[in-house]
Every structure is written in structure tokens, then in C-alpha cells.
């Protein structure tokens, strides 16, 4: 991310040191997936993550063996985390509202947009209005 001067990056739990990433990225946007874990979220906050992501909430072709998360982690985060909360994993236009109601501020919908056999990307995005 720093080599191409990206606005920031998103890291998985096995992508390297959070502290090292923050030092490299300085004031750039930096988020981390915390699966279904309060402990991982707390650690990410201590390491100055810009946002905290939880998931996978639903089955996804992208990461078929992803750790499953439930809505309780979003409810906990809404009460306890001051950073933006992102929901990830198998999200589509029929299941996203329950994630928002539970506490997600943002949703990651890459597979629904880019791997949708029925809709072109622009039309897929419009399904969320």
C-alpha cells in the first residue's frame, strides 16, 4: 500500500504485524478482520486500526473456509467500539439490512458486485438502495 501511495489497506489476521503495518502506513486508512472475536478487536484498537471488520457472516465463494461470525459480535461492537464497524462475508442485497441493524456501519460486498452472474457491477450496486 505504501509503495503505490494507496489511501490505505485491509489486513487479515495472518497478513503480518498490526503494529508494523501501522508504522508503515502512518496516517493512512488501516483496517483489520477480527472474525468473531472481541479479543482481536480490542487488539486492533490498541494498534490504532482505522476500522474493525467482523465476519464471515454468510457463506461466500471467495473464502469458503472463513471463520463464521454472528450478529452478537456486531451488537457488542456497536456498544464498545468507537471505530467504524465493517461486516464482511457473503453479503448481498437480501441479507445486509440485518447486519446494519445489528451495528455494522459499513458492508463489504465485493463478491456480490464482481462475481454476480446475473447482474453487471453497476446494477448489482443499485440493488442496495
Language-model region placement:
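Alpha/beta enzyme core
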Residues: 3-7, 38-55, 97-102
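Short, well-ordered coil/turn segments that N-cap beta-strands
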Residues: 5-7, 26-28, 48-50, 81-85, ...
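Hydrophobic faces of well-ordered beta-strands that scaffold small-molecule active sites
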Residues: 9-11, 30-33, 52-54, 85-89, ...
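Glycine-rich phosphate-binding active-site loops on the catalytic face of alpha/beta enzymes
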Residues: 13-20, 53-65, 96-129
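Alpha-helix-loop-beta-strand connector modules within alpha/beta enzyme cores
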Residues: 15, 19-37, 65-93, 126-129
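Ampipathic, surface-exposed secondary-structure segments
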Residues: 42-81
Amino acid at each position: 500500500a505504501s509503495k503505490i501511495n494507496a489511501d490505505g489497506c485491509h489486513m487479515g489476521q495472518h497478513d503480518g504485524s498490526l503494529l508494523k503495518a501501522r508504522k508503515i502506513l502512518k496516517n493512512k486508512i488501516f483496517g483489520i478482520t477480527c472474525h468473531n472475536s472481541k479479543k482481536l478487536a480490542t487488539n486492533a484498537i490498541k494498534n490504532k486500526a482505522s476500522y474493525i471488520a467482523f465476519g464471515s457472516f454468510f457463506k461466500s465463494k471467495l473464502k469458503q473456509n472463513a471463520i463464521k461470525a454472528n450478529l452478537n459480535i456486531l451488537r457488542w461492537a456497536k456498544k464498545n467500539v468507537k471505530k467504524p464497524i465493517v461486516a464482511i462475508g457473503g453479503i448481498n442485497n437480501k441479507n445486509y439490512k440485518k447486519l446494519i441493524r445489528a451495528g455494522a456501519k459499513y458492508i463489504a460486498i465485493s463478491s456480490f458486485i464482481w462475481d454476480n452472474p446475473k447482474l453487471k457491477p453497476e446494477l448489482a450496486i443499485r440493488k442496495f438502495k
